[in-house]
Structure formats: structure tokens, C-alpha cells
Amino acid sequence: MTTRQLKEIARSDLERIGVDIEQIRSIFFSETPGMNKAGSYYYADSRGFYCTGVGDRGRIIPEKKFRNLEDALFDIYWYITFLVSTDYAVRNKIPGQDWRRPMFSKRLELLKTLGDPYYLRGMKEIEVILASSPYRDSQPMKQ
């Protein structure tokens, strides 16, 4: 598989959740970081699937190697659904409720649209997060 094919699969899938991958300014499909622009650089070659990151100060983040296409796509989708669901959670904040409740709910909804394997894997990731950092709901202040 080529980097171009990887991008096309991600682009096509993400259209189903209303995301235009060309508008995401922190994900690139290229083997080399362009001018050290901050973001994640995904690429594929005959040996597998990879991601190299560039930090906001130009620091190169070590390369990740994925076992297969599904792992690479999950990494992409996990990040993009974070962006979308965080925006959703901010706009739909409920006083006294941990903001992660609507974020995780929206994120799982998006992953479900992308496919059951991504949804199930996302559920496991969220369970790990909540095991170490449970929801912190508070009572709204009474006036």
C-alpha cells in the first residue's frame, strides 16, 4: 500500500462523519515532515504503516510503527474524533457535569459510524482513561 492509498481510505471514511481531512491542519500524509510543521505525518510503504510527529517547537517525535492498516487508521480516527468531540463537548457543556461525558459520548458515536472495530477499540481506550481518571461531576451552584 502507498501513502496516497492510505490517505484516500482515511479521506473516504472520514467523509461519513462530515470531516474533510484536507481541513485538518495537524495531520499530513507524507514520509518527511514538511519544514518541521507541527503535526502527525502518516505514511505507508512496502514494510508497513508509520507515523512521525513534529512538536510545536519543531522537535521530532519518535516514529510509531503500526502492525496493520486497521491500527494506523484507528490512530488517525482516534485523533480526529478527539478534535470533533472536544468541540462538541465545549458547545454542549452541562453545568455540574464532567465535560468528558459529552465528549466521550460523541467520540464513540463517530467511531461507531466509522465501523464497529473502531467503536469497540475506542470503548476500551475510554475505559482505561476513566479507570485512572474517573468522571468528576459536581453539583451545580444554587442561586
Report residues per predicted region.
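Intrinsically disordered, low-complexity, charge-dense segments enriched in Lys/Arg
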Residues: 11, 86-143
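Short aromatic-glycine-(Arg/Gly/Cys) micro-motifs in beta-strand/loop hairpins
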Residues: 31-61
